[in-house]
Amino acid sequence: MDTNVIVTKKFNYITFVLMALGAIGLVYGFLTDTHRTWANLLLNNYYFLSLALGAAFFFSLQYITQSGWSAMFRRIPEALMAYIPYAAVIMLVMFFGLHDIYHWSHPDLVAGDELLAHKAPYLNVPFFMIRIVLFFAAWILLTRYLRKLSLQEDSLGGIEMF
């Protein structure tokens, strides 16, 4: 069975055309409705991040339980986990749109709302940024470590890691 993937020029062309259409759509969204575009970007990022984190959970569960049955399709969760660094970059870009997304990021609104003022130690921009950076750093380190273990298992053969 041949497992080599051959990427043709036509495939590359179609891929770049679709990426260009996506970029044009993103620019159009920012030009027409900034608030909706930031919200959609956040929602899409959370959706694909949840798939990647679910794959990381499944993958780590396989190592914790020393499961051998999943070895034949472990590349699928590895591929999904590869999205996490891209999600981190998108979240860093999202910092520019915090005021369009989160009500609590406006200090004048927090001062006038008793409930938001009570939650201010947790819901504030600096602490939010710190949390996001720390979460993504932990997730990226975890997934890189899991990937390293997977590659070591490939090079050693069998289940020598356990």
Q: Whereabouts are the PLM-identified features?
A:
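Hydrophobic alpha-helical transmembrane segments of polytopic
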Residues: 14-22, 45-52, 80-90, 127
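Alpha-helical transmembrane segments of multi-pass membrane proteins
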Residues: 16-35, 54-56, 94-100, 143-144
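Central hydrophobic cores of alpha-helical transmembrane segments in multi-pass inner-membrane proteins
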Residues: 22-26, 48-70, 139-147
